[in-house]
């Protein structure tokens, strides 16, 4: 069963077990410290000390007590998993500005500062450890053959459908930082509010 997700990296996160049963509330409820890895579409309640690692100083950074500037996905090599579960390589298009570092390097340096040094010191070594733990991630551009059981057919609920995305042009920090995307968003909003002309 393929589900179109509204957040980048969600499929890959599920593949490596980086999800919490019960969602964000279960993961953060009562937390004294929250390490936010660029999650700008979530609201973090007051109280916890927030460390934000991200690229565009968006919503997540505005709630942070400490900001660690990381590369945007276009500024570092990466491994992504698309909706159908296909691992894909992405190559850096440019270098991160200022003091921003590649995200894996920030986590590795922080682990050493905390006396819990992670067992890899390069992207190649990290990727090797990742593939050892999750072998399917080595099969670049291949769709895993998954067995599935048909879901039971039920009478649909009487709830109404709604769009999960309110503004397609401003769905993430990179898009929200773009002047072009802001213009497209404004044009789409004006088009939606304009009266329809009779033909």
Q: What is the predicted role of each segment?
A:
Residues 1-140, 192-199:
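Non-catalytic alpha/beta scaffold blocks inside enzyme catalytic domains
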